[in-house]
Amino acid sequence: MAVKIRLKRMGSKKAPFYRVVVADSRFPRDGRFIEEIGTYNPIAQPAQVNIKEDKALEWMKKGAKPSDTVRSLFSNAGLMEKLHNEKNGK
């Protein structure tokens, strides 16, 4: 089972709102997921990002791969650096 951390689109037409979810890569984008670990609202100025850091780190340590967009959100939040430091024992 290839697990991905990706965005699930919510909201209405022309007003997107996303949930950051952990899902099997074979499931549809807005379909079934394993766990919700955050939200992303690109419409708000500045964009609102809420991520459960402990859950995100836990899933990435288990091998879940973030999508490109989620990876960028995690980098801006400092999560990728935390993961790198934990893996290298700093």
From Swiss-Prot:
Protein's GO biological process: translation
Protein's UniProt name: Small ribosomal subunit protein bS16
UniProt cross-references to InterPro entries, sorted A to Z: Ribosomal_bS16, Ribosomal_bS16_dom_sf
Alphabetized SUPFAM superfamilies for the sequence: Ribosomal protein S16
Keyword ATP-binding: no
Recorded name of the encoding gene: rpsP
Signal peptide stretch: none
Family classification: Belongs to the bacterial ribosomal protein bS16 family.
HAMAP family per record: Ribosomal_bS16
Lipoprotein in keyword set: no
Pfam annotation, one family: Ribosomal_S16
A GO MF term: structural constituent of ribosome
Keywords: Ribonucleoprotein, Ribosomal protein
GO cellular component: cytoplasm; small ribosomal subunit
Organism annotation: Shouchella clausii (strain KSM-K16)
